[in-house]
Amino acid sequence: MKIVVYAICKNERPFADRWMASMSEADEVCVLDTGSTDGTPQRLEELGAKVSVQGITPWRFDVARNQSLELVPEDADLCVCTDLDEVFQPGWREKVEAAWAPGVDRLLYRYVWNFLPDGREGMVFWYDKIHRRKGCRWVNPVHEVLQFDGGAPQARYVEGVCLEHHADRSKSRGQYLPLLELAVEEDPNNDRNVHYL
């Protein structure tokens, strides 16, 4: 089974080493850098990632994710979308391979969105960014989700796989509001986007 991790990034050099170590169980790592000025693409390449640099104007997360997905080879069996401030607990690949089966479109796994000041897990929920290579695309300018061809995707839960989010608190999220407004304008009946707004 060929498993490929893909991601988008911009100025995330401090996370590169930890992230690449965590993703090393994959067969390949593909990254779309959207304009770093801190050496992120060079460091990722030194660590073995295949990096493409391309600005996205106007900025939309779905466009960036779709362009990063295009970097994944067509012969990949599974795609794993993560961000550079996320890390898998070791041993994730074996569990992902065991859970995958014909007819499955995506896998659901445990996601620790944040940690409390004392180090305990904060918000935890099921995440769904491990998916088949073909017949899906990212939608929504922000808080993007995968949309699958052919109706509702078949999902399977993976026990024992956990992705941890260690957010960069210094990064502004100021761009999110206009993107949320655009998302609601594009799809006013999308209750998820209305909720975020």
Task: Give the residues covered by each predicted segment.
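Cell-envelope/extracellular polymer assembly enzymes that use nucleotide-activated donors
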Residues: 2-4, 28
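Short beta-strand-to-loop acidic/aromatic patch adjacent to the donor-nucleotide binding site
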Residues: 70-89
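Conserved donor nucleotide-binding strand/loop of the catalytic core
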Residues: 41-71
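Short, well-ordered alpha-helix to beta-strand connector turns
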Residues: 26-27, 48, 76, 104
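Catalytic-site signature of metal-activated, phosphate-bearing donor transferases
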Residues: 62-70, 88-197
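Short, well-formed alpha-helical segments that are part of the catalytic scaffolds
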Residues: 7-25
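A conserved acidic beta->alpha catalytic loop
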Residues: 22, 32-43, 56-57, 83-86
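Acidic helix N-cap motif at the loop->helix transition within catalytic regions
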Residues: 14-17, 38-47, 91
